[in-house]
Amino acid sequence: MVANTTGEIFKVTTFGLSHGKALGATIDGCPAGLNLSNEDIQNELNKRRPGTSNLTTSRDEKDKVEILSGIFNGMTDGTPITAIIFNKDQRSKNYDNLKNNPRPGHGDFCWREKFGNYDYRGGGRGSGRVTIGHVIGGAVSKKLLQQHNITTTAHVTSIHNIHSTKKFTLNTIKENITKNNVRCADLEVATLMEDEILKLKERGDSTGGKVEIIIDNVPVGLGQPVFDKIDGDFAKALMNIGAVKAVEVGCGIESSTLTGHEMNDEYYIEDNKIQTKTNNAGGIVGGMTNGMPIILKISVKPTPSVSGIQNTVNLEKRENSTIEIEGRHDPCICPRITTVAEAVCNMVLADHMIRAGYIHPDKIN
């Protein structure tokens, strides 16, 4: 059995395949009265669209979205919202050799063994292209969260062995990531990152990196202890992005090296607002938001589609074999994954905002 739906009240179901006819999402549980247009969704899809720079796959998809249902007079009507895009630039013949030869690093083997009848073209349902549905769901939830001035910003902090260590204000991050193709706030380091990606692309290799997500203006108390803690839901949502191999909250793995005095975020009150002097917890304690900015970090693996001959097995003959991967692939998925990370975090937030009573489940007040 596959799991294509996420959320308790604000539910997002994604559909489609890399080389199928179409992809999209159905959002159920969005209250009525939210202004929502094609443009709202298209703007987000454009940020993850392939073929926009020499750092991405050359697959030329425009990803033009069409809203099929759930909108009346320019606003949501409380019924399921379905939005779809149609694939235009598939080259399925490049994947003929994958039918019985799973690619190292991809999910081909597991999909084939579990389901048997598996559309292997372009990775099928396991392709990064299916995150189009994530971004559609994220665009709708982003509009909901804007009613409460909640913003989610993801930016690249490292590519391969190149790291950005400078600290920037949130406004500077938002501004700078639009000025380069890797979506890094450090403009000098961004140039080095681009050069590194292009160097690896030239030799048929790939790389990964790290992305930080900052969520601002979140109210206190989102999260449902003990099994629906909000950090657990963020971690699940982010780990469900295919290339993500680790999630950190706040100072993350560094917390294991600190003392209690170093780790604890001390409280203070200013202008009748309770805050913490530091934010090592990343805005989440006890599985609930504490009103400070939420800080999440993800580690993204290298794109597994690389040039050259690799060892694999022939599943039909049950014998060792080799494979040489063709097709068009990203040398580094980090720049495009920022939009997907923002999307899934917004979906989690929208669901918890409704569950906590901050957003009415039936209509926008």
From Swiss-Prot:
Reduced FMN (FMNH(2)). Keywords: Amino-acid biosynthesis, Aromatic amino acid biosynthesis, FAD, Flavoprotein, FMN, Lyase, NADP. FMN binds at R125, G126, S127, G286, K301, P302, T303, P304, S305, R328. It is an enzyme of class 4 (lyase). InterPro entries: Chorismate_synth (IPR000453), Chorismate_synth_AroC_sf (IPR035904), Chorismate_synthase_CS (IPR020541). It comes from the Archaea. Its EC number is 4.2.3.5. It catalyses: 5-O-(1-carboxyvinyl)-3-phosphoshikimate = chorismate + phosphate. GO terms for molecular function: chorismate synthase activity; FMN binding. PROSITE patterns: CHORISMATE_SYNTHASE_2 (PS00788), CHORISMATE_SYNTHASE_3 (PS00789). GO terms for biological process: amino acid biosynthetic process; aromatic amino acid family biosynthetic process; chorismate biosynthetic process. Pathway: Metabolic intermediate biosynthesis; chorismate biosynthesis; chorismate from D-erythrose 4-phosphate and phosphoenolpyruvate: step 7/7. Its cofactor is FMNH2. One of its GO terms (cellular component) is cytosol. NADP(+) binds at R48. Belongs to the chorismate synthase family. PANTHER family: CHORISMATE SYNTHASE. NCBIfam families: aroC (TIGR00033), PRK05382.1 (NF003793). This reaction introduces a second double bond into the aromatic ring system. This is Chorismate synthase. The lineage of its organism: Archaea, Methanobacteriati, Methanobacteriota, Methanomada group, Methanobacteria.
